[in-house]
C-alpha cells in the first residue's frame, strides 16, 4: 500500500522503500508467505521503479533468489533461500579471510620486531594516492630518500605514485596489508584506522585528518544515521592511538579537541600539507596539466561543483543513493558556449553517476586522485556544506554555496559549526535560478 501512495517525485523515499522491500523478499519471503499470496508480492516487485538499480546492490545468489521471487515462483525461491543460508552459515564457520589474516597477525607478525625505518601510509582507505599523506610522502622522498621504506595502501595502481621514488604498494585488508601494518614503526593516515588494526607500543601514528570541519563531528553530533550505535566509542578509541593530529587552523584545533576528545598538546596546528600546492610557483602549469588529463578545452571557464555527502543518502550498511540537485541541463543551455562543469562528488557515490547526456560540458573529476590539483584548474567553486571551500579559499577565487536543502540539513541531519548565513565567504543560493543568476554575474 505504501508504494501506491508515494508521489512519483518522491524518488528518494521510493528508493529506500524498494530497498527494504527487497530485503524482506531476500531474507524472509519464501519461508513466511502463503503460496496463494505469492502473485501479489511478485506484482509488487514487478512494479518497482528502481528494480534495476536496487538489484545491483546484491550478490549473484541473492539476485537469483530475488529474480525468481519477482516471477512469482515460490517453490523455486525456497531452495535458493535455503542454499544461501547454508552458504552464509558455512562461511561463518570457516571464518572470513581477514579473520585468518588476523590469526597470523597476533601469533606471528606482531611478534616480529618493529621496523622504525618503515612508514605505513594510507589515504581514504586505499582509494586514492592523494591528500596530505601524498604530500608528506613526496616531501619525505625528496628530503629523506632511501632512509625509509615507504608502504602505500592503494587498491589500484596510480601513475602519479609510480613516478615517485622507491615504494611498496599493498591493497587494503590484504595479507601484505596486515603484515606491514604490524611491523611499520610509523603510520600516516587521513581517516580513522580499522578497529581491528591496533598499533603496537613504539609506533608513531600521525593522523592528518582530511578537512576543516564545517559539519559537526563525532562527540558534537546528537544523531548519527549512517553509523552504528557505538560510533562515538570507536572514535574515542581510535583517537587514543594517534600520537599527533594535524590541524589547519585554530578553529579546527578547538573543534578537534572537543569533538574527538583529544589532547590539545598533541594537535599540530601547521596547516594541511595538501594545500602547499595552492601556493606553488608553477600552479598555472599544474592547472594546464589537469585540464589536459581530463580533456577540458583551453579557454573555457571551469565551474567546480563539489556537493557534500549527506547522511540521509545512506540507506543500508555500505549502500547509498544520490540525486544531483544542480540542473546540469540548464547550466549547459545557459553557459555551454564558454564554460564547463567539473564535478567532484563524495567517494561513496563516485561510481553511480551517469553523465553521458552532458558529454563535452560536464567532466567527472570524482575519481581524480588529487582534489587540490582540481582547485588549481577551476575558476569558480560551487559547493554546499563541504569543507572544500576552506581549501579553495586559499586561491581567492569566487565561491558559491548552493544549499537547496539548507533548513533541513542544518536542523535535522548534522548541524553546523558556523553561522552559514553570516560567516561564509560567498552567497547562499537555494534554487537553480539563483545559481544561474550568480554565474551570469
Question: Across the structure, where does each feature detected by a protein language model lie?
Answer:
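Catalytic binding pocket for nucleotide-activated donors in carbohydrate/polymer assembly enzymes
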Residues: 356-360, 387-441
